[in-house]
Amino acid sequence: MDVAAAEAALRREAHDVHGWSNGPHDVYAEHEHSYTKALVCVRGSIEFRLADGRTVHLRAGDRLVLPPGTRHSAVVGPEGVACIEGEQR
């Protein structure tokens, strides 16, 4: 995965673009954002669980856009994860 290209593409449509990473099996409790969140997985994997019951699995190269107010939780895969994200314009 070309991380620099993915970040450049995200910067064209979002602001406050930043990267983050987590270790294997880390968990994010259910929460929501007041903005549209655009996220690209650049390494590893993560599973997002949406409040409506859907599950979205992301691996390197996959992208997810969460509209404002979308309640979600997440569980990192067995190899950890690294993502870049931003607030979509």
Label for each model-derived stretch:
Residues 24, 34, 54, 70-71, ...:
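A generic "binding-loop/recognition-motif" signal
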